[in-house]
Curated annotation (Swiss-Prot):
Subunit field text: Heterotrimer of A, B and C subunits.
Organism: Mycobacterium leprae (strain TN)
Upper taxonomic lineage: Bacteria, Bacillati, Actinomycetota, Actinomycetes, Mycobacteriales
Name of the protein described by the UniProt record: Glutamyl-tRNA(Gln) amidotransferase subunit A
Cellular component, GO annotation: glutamyl-tRNA(Gln) amidotransferase complex
Origin superkingdom: Bacteria
Biological role stated in the UniProt entry: Allows the formation of correctly charged Gln-tRNA(Gln) through the transamidation of misacylated Glu-tRNA(Gln) in organisms which lack glutaminyl-tRNA synthetase. The reaction takes place in the presence of glutamine and ATP through an activated gamma-phospho-Glu-tRNA(Gln).
Coiled-coil portions: none
Length: 497
C-alpha cells in the first residue's frame, strides 16, 4: 500500500490518476502530500510565489466525491495536482508575473488555460516563480527573489519558468504549466531533468496569458515523463475564439503518439541534426550527452542526417529586436491608471509624473532594458534598419526549417549550450544571458513546436542535460513519439532529491 509522503510525491501523474480511479489513493491525499512537500522544501527552492492550499484541497475533495459516487471523471488527470506559472490569470489567486508592479493584483477573469485545468478536475496548488514578465533565462529577475535548482541550490533552474521546473524536480507537484517565449519551458526543463513542451503557436490559447511578446509567447505543459506531459498537453490544447491567434486546426493525437513511442520503435523516422546548434561555445559534457542521445535514436531504428539551417546564425540578433519591440508595446498598459502599482499619486503631480514614478519603481532592470531597446528599434528612422530587418530574418529562419522538414521528420539539438550556471554568474552580463537561449528561440520565431527531454547528466558536473526535439507546426505528435521512445530506451535517471 502506497501512503507515505516520500512514496506518493515520487509517482508520475498517470500512475497517480490510475490510483485515484482505483481508489488506492485519494486526490486529497495526493494534494496534501504535495502541499506538505512544498511546506517542507520551498523555503530552500522558492519555486512558489503563492500557495493555495485550501482551494487545492477543495478541488481535490470534489474529485474524490465523484469517484466515490461512481461518476465519470472530467479528464484522465482529474485529481492530480498542478503548479501554475504566475503569468496565467486566476480570479482566486494573485497574478504578479514576478513583478512588483502587479504585487497583490487579482485578475477579474481566469485564463483559458486556467479554465480548462479547472474543468479537467486538476487541483491548482499555487502560482510559481518566474523572471519578471517572462524576461530572463534564470528566474533571477523575479521581484520576489530567485528560484534555486533542486539539483544544486547554488545553480539556477533556468528561466523564465524556473519555478514550474523546480517544483517538478523537487517533487512539489507532478504536473506544471509554463509559457515559452524563447525557450522558457524547454530551457528550465533541460536544467532540471524534467520534460517541457512548447506547442505549435496558436494551439494553446493565450487568452489570460499576460503578454511579453505576443507573436512569440506560447503556453505549454511540463511534467516528469513524456506521457504525463502529453496528457496535460491534451487538456489545455484546442481552439479558443477569445484568442485571435488561436488556430482552428485539429490537435494531433499526442497521447496516442506518446504511448506508441513507448514501444521504442523508430524505424522509418528521419532525424536531422542541426549543424548550427552544436560546436563552439557548447560544454563538452552537453555535447557528449547529445551524441549519446543521437546514437540511441539510431539504435531505435531512426535514420540520422545533418541538416543545415544557415539563418539560425542570425536568430539571436533577430529575436532580441523583435521581442523587445513587442515588449515595449505590450507593457505600455502598465501606466498606474488601470491596475497594479501606483506611486506618487498625492495630488501634487501630473499624470505623466505618476506614470513615470510608477514604472520606475515597479519594473526591474531587465524589463526596463528591453522596453528601451524596443522603443529604440521601433522609433522613426530606425524601424527599417532594425525591426523590419529582423522580421525578414524571421521569415528566412522559417524557410530554413520548412526546407529541412522536406527531408526529415524531426530535428534534434542540445536544449541548452551548457548545464545550469551559478546564481549571479550572468546577472551583470545581459549578452551572456541572452546567448543561453541560442538553441531554443528559433522555434519561437517560426511558430513551430519543440520538446526538451532529459538525456542524462553531464560528465563535467553531474548536472542535467536536455535533448531538444523539434517538429513542424501542427506536428506536435512527432515530438511525443520520438521523445517517449528515447525516454524508454534511456531508462530511469537519478532524482534531484
Amino acid at each position: 500500500m502506497i501512503g507515505s509522503l516520500h512514496e506518493i510525491i515520487r509517482l508520475d501523474a498517470s500512475t497517480l490518476a490510475a490510483k485515484i480511479v482505483a481508489k488506492e489513493l485519494s486526490s486529497v491525499e495526493i494534494t496534501q502530500a504535495c502541499l506538505d512537500q512544498i511546506e517542507a522544501t520551498d523555503d530552500t527552492y522558492r519555486a512558489f510565489l503563492h500557495v493555495a492550499a485550501e482551494k487545492a484541497l477543495s478541488a481535490a475533495a470534489a474529485v474524490d466525491k465523484a469517484v466515490a459516487a461512481g461518476g465519470q471523471l472530467s479528464s484522465t488527470l482529474a485529481g492530480v495536482p498542478l503548479a501554475l506559472k504566475d503569468v496565467f490569470t486566476t480570479v482566486d489567486m494573485p497574478t504578479t508575473c514576478g513583478s512588483k508592479i502587479l504585487q497583490g493584483w487579482h485578475s477579474p477573469y481566469d485564463a483559458t488555460v486556467t479554465t480548462r485545468l479547472r474543468a479537467a478536475g486538476i487541483p491548482i496548488l499555487g502560482k510559481t516563480n518566474m523572471d519578471e514578465f517572462a524576461m530572463g533565462s534564470s528566474t533571477e529577475n523575479s521581484a520576489y527573489g530567485p528560484t534555486r535548482n533542486p539539483w544544486n541550490v547554488d545553480r539556477v533552474p533556468g528561466g523564465s519558468g524556473g519555478g514550474s521546473a523546480a517544483a517538478l524536480a523537487a517533487f512539489q507537484a507532478p504536473l506544471a504549466i509554463g509559457s515559452d517565449t524563447g525557450g522558457s519551458i524547454r530551457q528550465p526543463a533541460a536544467l532540471t531533468a524534467t520534460v517541457g513542451v512548447k506547442p505549435t503557436y496558436g494551439t494553446v490559447s493565450r487568452y489570460g496569458l499576460v503578454a511579453c511578446a505576443s507573436s512569440l509567447d506560447q503556453g505549454g505543459p511540463c511534467a516528469r515523463t513524456v506521457l504525463d506531459t502529453a496528457l496535460l498537453h491534451a487538456v489545455i490544447a484546442g481552439h479558443d475564439a477569445r484568442d485571435s491567434t488561436s488556430v482552428e486546426a485539429a490537435v494531433p493525437d499526442i497521447v496516442g503518439a506518446a504511448k506508441a513511442g513507448e514501444s521504442g520503435d523508430l524505424h522509418g523516422v528521419r532525424v536531422g541534426v542541426v549543424r548550427q546548434l552544436r560546436g563552439e561555445g557548447y560544454q563538452s559534457g552537453v555535447l557528449a550527452s547529445f551524441q549519446a542521445a543521437v546514437e540511441q535514436l539510431i539504435a531505435l531504428g531512426a535514420t540520422v542526417s545533418e541538416v543545415d539551417c544557415p539563418h539560425f546564425d542570425y536568430a539571436l540578433a533577430a529575436y532580441y529586436l523583435i521581442l523587445p519591440s513587442e515588449v515595449s508595446s505590450n507593457l505600455a498598459r502598465f501606466d498606474a491608471m488601470r491596475y497594479g502599482l501606483r506611486v506618487g499619486d498625492d495630488g501634487s503631480r501630473s499624470a505623466e509624473e505618476v506614470i513615470a514614478l510608477t514604472r520606475a519603481a515597479g519594473f526591474g532592470p531587465e524589463v526596463k532594458r528591453r522596453i528601451m531597446i524596443g522603443a529604440y528599434a521601433l522609433s522613426a528612422g530606425y524601424y527599417d534598419s532594425y525591426y523590419s530587418q529582423a522580421q525578414k530574418v524571421r521569415t528566412l529562419i522559417a524557410r530554413d526549417l520548412d526546407k529541412a522538414y522536406r527531408s526529415v521528420d524531426v530535428l534534434v539539438s542540445p536544449a541548452t549550450p551548457t548545464t545550469a550556471f551559478s546564481l549571479g554568474e550572468k546577472a551583470d552580463d545581459p549578452l551572456a544571458m541572452y546567448l543561453f537561449d541560442l538553441c531554443t528561440l528559433p522555434l519561437n520565431l517560426a511558430g513551430h513546436c519543440g520538446m526538451s527531454v532529459p538525456s542524462g547528466l553531464s560528465s563535467d558536473d553531474d548536472l542535467p542535460v536536455g535533448l531538444q526535439i523539434m517538429a513542424p507546426a501542427l506536428a506536435d505528435d512527432r515530438l511525443y513519439r520520438v521523445g517517449a521512445a528515447y525516454e524508454a530506451a534511456r531508462g530511469p535517471l537519478p532524482s534531484a532529491i
